[in-house]
Amino acid sequence: MEGLTYKYYKKNNSKNIYLIIHGGGPVGVETDFISAIFDTIAKTHNSALCFNFPYCERREESSSGPDLLEEVSTLKQVIDFIHTEGYNRITIIAKSLGGIISGYYFAKYPDKSIDLIILGYIPNEVKQNAISDNLKLVIQGENDRFAAPSEVHKIVGNKVAVIEIKNADHSYQNHNKEPIYQNEVLDHLVNWI
């Protein structure tokens, strides 16, 4: 975890941790939505951890490149840290780019013991074959520019729950770019936990 900006809520005696992976852009864990996910998970009496990828620390808009080498290496470092903390169950909650990075991670480091939730699935970018044993839930906006929930369901199959957020875009905002559907996403996460 050296060199990373992160938030870590360690619930005493908890064997479950939720690892929250932010989406694209230079803000990372400081976005209101990622912070709200972190706070919501902490209220469920589970441990939670979220961190910035190095490109955020450099205030860059984009990830390290098409193979996401730096991001996969960083995610491995974080998951290794989580294992040393003694957790029995790891669930990744990945927003958008975080889902893509998770796919690259599982392609390189398969681990069926880690569950994956994707908030805003991006077809043709997510390595579905690499995450097929991990993916449990997708929460997708009805008006997501990358794929409608029905398209996502066709890709991920019947073993994965796909929840549609009516009228929401990829960031769970309305047509005026107001994030009015993000609380609905948080409610679905809590119900799933």
Task: Give the location of each predicted region.
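Serine-hydrolase catalytic machinery in alpha/beta-hydrolase-like enzymes
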Residues: 2-85
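Conserved alpha/beta-hydrolase "acid-adjacent" motif
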Residues: 145-151
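Short beta-strand/loop motif that positions the catalytic acidic residue
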Residues: 132, 137-140, 144
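Primarily recognizes the serine-hydrolase "nucleophile elbow" in alpha/beta-hydrolase
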Residues: 78-134
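Catalytic histidine-centered segment of alpha/beta-hydrolase-like enzymes
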Residues: 168-182
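Alpha/beta-hydrolase
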Residues: 21-24, 119, 165
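Acidic beta-to-alpha connecting loop that harbors the catalytic carboxylate
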Residues: 142-145, 166-169
